[in-house]
Amino acid sequence: MPRFDALYEDTRKQLLILPSWRRSISGAYDEKTSSVYFDGFVETDYFKFYNGLINDERLLSKMREKGYKGLFCLHPIFMKQYVDFQNNDVFDVNEGFVDYNKVFAESAAMVTDYSTIAFDFAYLKKPIVYTQFDQKQFYEDQVYDKGFFEYETDGFGPVCYDLDSAVNELVELIDNDCKNKYIDRVENFFVNIDKNNSKRVLDAIIEDDKKRNK
């Protein structure tokens, strides 16, 4: 994809957590901010999982030991819920819009769930951990169906279905300096990993235009 050409690397000891949204627990839509505060948010499994993850003492202890910091970025639809999450000395909860290319560049590893931004991060050959504690409900509630991409067999990292397994994977990952064990999947999935995606698309458009005008 052409947008991959804008990706760059400035890797630091940072763990990025960037999950998608949930239709069933989002507040009403606001034209100016795209979201409103949802009063029942703290009672949801979504909040309990991610607040538990960024405050898990095993994970925090390992990150302190290895000198890592964490950045938790909510989806824009959930942006106003940042006040519900508990900050600590390791994790910052982002309060506004995200410069995705910047946080991708600076992060050594990423946690996400079903978000397609995982493809951008994987393109940088950096490790990903998927957190899908609500997989069945997610596909029942969202506005789109499960596609051909199977996370367990096609994904760019382990799939975790509960908090304990997610913490275990992250502790091991950080303990090994975020070495990517799924690099073969990344290299087999992407035909080209370079800065020439825009050129290839443009060349294909020009070639197609020539054929149409013969």
Where are these regions (language model features)?
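Short, solvent-exposed loop/turn segments at secondary-structure junctions
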Residues: 20-24, 75-79, 116-118, 134-137, ...
